Amino acid sequence: MISHYPLASLLPWPPVPQLLDIDGDGGVALQRYQPRSPETGPRYWSSVQDWGEEVEEGAIYNVTLKRVQIQQAANKGARWLGAEGDRLPPGHTVSQLETCKIRSIRAGTLERLVETLLTAFGDNDLTYTSIFLSTYRAFASTQSVLELLLDRYGSFEDCEGERSQCQTGESRKAVRKALASILRAWLDQCPEDFQEPPSYPSLHRVLGFLQKAMPGSEPMRRAQSLLEQLRVQASLENETEGGFQCINPFCLGEDEEVEIDLQEDFFSFEVDLVAEQLTYMDALLFKKVVPHHCLGSIWSQRDKKDGKQSAPTIRATITQFNAVTACVVSTILRQRQIRPHLCARIIQRWIDIAQECRIRKNFSSLRAIVSALQSNPLYRLKRTWASVAKDSMQMFEELSDIFSDQNNYLTSRELLMREGTSKFASLDSCAKDHQKRSQKRLQLQKDMGAMQGTIPYLGTFLTDLTMLDTALPDQVEGGLINFEKRRREFEVIAQIKLLQSACNSYCLTPDPAFFRWFKSQPQYSEEESYVLSCEVEGLGDNSPTSPKPRKSMVKRLSLLFLGNDSTNTSSPVRESPRSPPTGSSGESMDSVSVSSSDSSPSESDGMTPTHSIDAHLKKLSESSSCNSLHSMDTSSSTASASISLASPTLPGPPCNHRRSISLTPLMSPTSPGFPPAYNTQAQDACIIRVSLEQGNGNLYKSIMLTSQDKTPAVISRAMTKHNLEGEQAADYELVQVISEERELVIPDNANVFYAMSTSANFDFLLRLRGSEGRPVQLRSRCSSTLPRTQQRSSLSLRLSKVTL
């Protein structure tokens, strides 16, 4: 519905009577007068004005007024006859401003949200259907939405004389048209919702309705086509017996694996070919990502019993990221007796490949390569890094700075926003030789008309969506579904969809020879990588020309599986004796990886080499993006922290950390409704982290705490997060960890927001009543020394390998 309001009601100052004196008998009659501010003009006025709320039964609406410009006939007679302004010549129309009312639902019951699908267009909420279809899985199932949509609004033909449901023929026609539009959008935008082999009940239900209500219509043809497509896809998956990954052309079978001499074949592939093939694989996987799998409420369920197979498209992307990282490590460390200058050549080649990925706007493989080169087994090779050419070192610094964690990874976010939909990358390098080569390569691509898509680092979006899910409540007053939260989530999902569309610009061809070589690369565990690294350069090897220490500024994509805070200590520059192994069974290049098989905690409790974990774990507690990581719900069987023995020694300025929690690149810390930060009480709310005592405090869950929350409610929410629904909340007590020697037991009926200590970290424990308190395991935020060897043993046992 469009409602019209006097334009004067929207002016920034109160209207006053205006008089116009005209001397003489002649002149032009004044038909319309609009007062103007002497200081500002119309271009400074806001075209949208908040008008308040409208509350109905089961729904709350936000109402805004928007000024729109329309063309009307200048002649009164033409207006009276209903002539449309856009069909008249330019000289016969006048521009006028109209005010339209926009009603957007802020919260409501599921029934009202489904009903709004039919009325949103009339309320001028033009994006509602896309937002609902992209986010409804967080609060409803496909079957429940279909039941409400088709049974309640699609059965008018069966009604007989009931005015409450059976309206006029025109109304039925309008409802049928709206249903057709919704179903067509659903089938086009979310075909995965109907992937329910072998019977496909939801899709058959849609087909049954369309055959009865709209036979031969476009939505019906689309539904029939989708059914055939899903059946063919299911038959192919049954033949390969491997699910998602085996249908990828770069996932070769075991019989296709061949042993290849590593170094010879690595140098036999041109740098641009390697980057092109990595981009081909990443683009194929990213285009298959189902955007709603990234929602925090869905992604956080992956570790529950019924969620082991959830988000397969995200898992496939993470597995590919780890495979690239492992490939970088294996090519450098596999030749155990390699000389430093030869090892430096391999590193320089990977830096060149990373730059080629940058030219192709493949930020996923770019980050994987940089992350691997910054991992401890490679970063500790001081003599090797001393042999790397200065120009390559400078280029590596520039590529690393793209993923600087300062200001919530602002550099990478701005770069992604700037180049997300551009045809080519915008390169600016201080390394002269690389700059000339890159510009030449880029100019060649432009001359050939080969446009580039954009492959983002998916972890940024997962972090933002998880933070949104943690900070904003699912329900508001009266138990209504908080749909405003879904609008905020859709802002992030829309960016993912936009970049997926941009990936269609790539025109790449797979190279089977490269795939065979890539598939044949071993994936070393952190333990194995460190052993090989020590064989290349021993513990006592030092180079007088080693670059200055530099903190790693890149966290791997697999850190998104971390729900633990582990230990946040600063890293020393010196190396320390390595702890003896205790049976690590890792499959990745280091302890931060993802494998395609499940493992129990007992299988992944092995010891890994440890060092200062400042570069990764301090950032987990101090950088805002990593604050988002704290909110991820994970289990200890799928968590791991990247740890190593010595800080790499590349030059660069020290990292400065600043607290901010920008949820999307468009949000600012001062925007209204900004979610609270960890360790900060603001606007009567804060985020606390609750772990189980029997879990050694390693696995925590982030909880939104308000000034109204009492102890029993907080305990119940924490138990739900930790999958303890079957136990009684009265059997547990809430304890805040103050220091290694002190803790604060929150009283049973206290207001936790005011009872907690704000001078300590907001870290809490769930403890069974009557149990003896264990020694407090703190996640230090300021230690600058390496833990002793015996302390490292207990730390390593707390870090389990990431598996799917």
Swiss-Prot record:
GO molecular function: guanyl-nucleotide exchange factor activity
Top-level division of the source organism's lineage: Eukaryota
Region annotation (Disordered) ranges: 564-611, 640-676
Gene3D superfamilies per the UniProt record, alphabetical: Phosphatidylinositol 3-kinase Catalytic Subunit, Chain A, domain 1, Ras guanine-nucleotide exchange factors catalytic domain, Son of sevenless (SoS) protein Chain: S domain 1
Composition skew (Polar residues), residue ranges: 661-671
Family matches, as PROSITE patterns: RA, RASGEF, RASGEF_CAT, RASGEF_NTER
Positions of the Ras-associating domain: 684-771
All residue ranges annotated as the N-terminal Ras-GEF domain in the record: 101-231
Alphabetical list of SUPFAM superfamilies matching this protein: Ras GEF (SSF48366), Ubiquitin-like (SSF54236)
Residue stretches of biased makeup (Low complexity): 581-607, 640-649
InterPro entries: RA_dom (IPR000159), Ras-like_GEF (IPR008937), Ras-like_Gua-exchang_fac_N (IPR000651), Ras_G-nucl-exch_fac_CS (IPR019804), Ras_GEF_dom_sf (IPR023578), RASGEF_cat_dom (IPR001895), RASGEF_cat_dom_sf (IPR036964), RGL1_RA (IPR030748)
Record keyword Disulfide bond present: no
Domain Ras-GEF: start-end pairs: 270-539
Swiss-Prot/TrEMBL GO biological process terms: Ras protein signal transduction
GO cellular component annotations of the record: plasma membrane
Keywords: Guanine-nucleotide releasing factor
PANTHER family: GUANINE NUCLEOTIDE EXCHANGE FACTOR, RAL GUANINE NUCLEOTIDE DISSOCIATION STIMULATOR-LIKE 1
Known function: Probable guanine nucleotide exchange factor.
Protein name per UniProt: Ral guanine nucleotide dissociation stimulator-like 1
Organism: Danio rerio
